[in-house]
UniProtKB/Swiss-Prot annotation:
GO cellular component, one term: post-mRNA release spliceosomal complex
Keywords for this protein: Coiled coil, mRNA processing, mRNA splicing, Nucleus, Spliceosome
Annotated coiled-coil segments of the chain: 1-29
Gene designation: Syf2
GO molecular function: RNA binding
GO biological process: mRNA splicing, via spliceosome
Record localization: Nucleus
Organism: Drosophila melanogaster
Record-given protein name: Pre-mRNA-splicing factor Syf2
Transmembrane helix found in the keyword field: no
Alphabetical list of InterPro entries matching this protein: mRNA_splic_SYF2
């Protein structure tokens, strides 16, 4: 038979539970206060603080790994490449190319010309000093050019240079076709727009709502919706 607790024992248990609840409330209050202080401190930090922190940590780790590789007499760049998959390496290379010569779409003809110029300059081969000195010796004073200098028939392009020019022109033509592709207008299609901007807007609406409005549109065309 279970022993009946006395009033003093019951009171002691209640006090113990109240004390435990009080401790938990104090702990929760302390935790909440610390979280509020931490959140306020985070709000006062710059917007890009987390990114800068991650970058600083990455730089420290990279410097440490580089120093360890040098101490062991190993090529750090080669070790890094061994840890990168072919897919990631290709993605990094493409990202680097986009950063060096980004394609932001057409803005002005001057910007497009400057972008093409930078791309062509970067694709130029390394300078051949021997060829430079040889041409300088062959052409003499005409090498630097002047108001009355004529180099016609005195210079000859190599087959490799000609092939490179042809290849580059073909690539430019292909890129121009891709960026300047015009969509053929269908004469039999319904005309539900008043200009090009309105046509694009209607196409966006069709992508989202055509399945819901197809029946209503058909009824309106047949005149059965009245």
């Amino acid at each position: 038979m279970e022993k009946t607790k006395t009033a003093a024992e019951k009171l002691a248990e209640r006090k113990a539970r109240l004390l435990d609840l009080h401790k938990k409330r104090q702990e929760a209050r302390t935790d909440n206060h610390q979280e509020v202080v931490a959140e306020d401190a985070r709000k006062k930090l710059p917007k890009n603080w987390e990114a800068r922190k991650r970058q600083a940590e990455w730089i420290l780790a990279d410097d440490k790994a580089r120093a360890e590789a040098q101490a062991a007499g190993k090529d750090y760049e080669r070790l890094k490449l061994l840890e990168v998959s072919a897919v990631d390496a290709d993605r990094i290379e493409k990202k680097k190319k986009r950063k060096d010569n980004p394609d932001l779409g057409f803005s002005t003809y001057e910007a497009q010309t400057a972008r093409q110029y930078n791309r062509l300059v970067k694709s130029m081969p390394a300078r051949d000093l021997e060829k430079y000195e040889r041409q300088k010796e062959e052409l003499g004073d005409a090498f630097y050019g002047g108001a009355h200098t004529t180099l016609h028939s005195r210079t000859k392009d190599t087959p490799g240079a000609i092939n490179k020019m042809v290849t580059d022109l073909e690539q430019q033509i292909e890129r121009r076709k891709k960026y300047s592709r015009r969509r053929i207008y269908n004469d039999d299609a319904d005309v539900d727009f008043i200009n090009e901007r309105n046509s694009k807007f209607n196409k966006k609406l069709d992508r989202f709502y055509s399945e819901h409005t197809a029946e209503i549109k058909q009824n309106l065309e047949r005149g059965t919706a009245i």
